[in-house]
Design a protein with these regions (language model features):
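Extended substrate/RNA-proximal surfaces in nucleic-acid metabolism proteins
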Residues: 19-121
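Active-site environment of divalent metal-dependent phosphoester hydrolases
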Residues: 4-14, 34-36, 121
Length: 121
């Protein structure tokens, strides 16, 4: 079993799911949210589709800060053949405009499970 959780995005999950299926590995679809307080929260869903729908809803709460590729690298969206199909221009590691409690509530409302990340910080 693996879980792949990109920051504030689920767009690479279809490619990860295809790779996991080829290798007979169970995928737990997820994302890592950065809350308004800059706390990190993992969220897991039963299906890739549910996680992607949640990711689309969360995207509206991400600051429109552009990614600095020289500093953060290219934010690629890949397909199942490991080919780039898109580049995310918005900085994905930025904080959402939602506080921790609101993120947790939205995850639960969407049928997901939330787990605080990096709790030693």
């Amino acid at each position: 079993m693996i879980a792949v959780c990109d920051h504030n995005s689920a767009r690479n999950l279809p490619a990860v799911k295809a790779a996991a299926d080829r290798m007979n590995v169970l995928l737990l679809p997820g994302m890592e949210l950065t809350t308004r307080e800059e706390a990190h929260m993992l969220c897991y869903f039963r299906t890739v589709q549910a996680c992607m729908a949640f990711g689309e809803a969360i995207y509206a709460h991400l600051a429109p800060t552009p990614n600095n590729e020289r500093f953060f690298g290219r934010q690629q969206v890949m397909n199942e053949r490991d080919e780039e199909i898109d580049v995310e221009e918005r900085l994905l590691i930025g904080a959402l405009d939602l506080p921790f409690e609101a993120c947790a509530a939205r995850i639960r409302e969407a049928g997901g499970l939330c787990v605080p990340a990096h709790i030693n910080r």
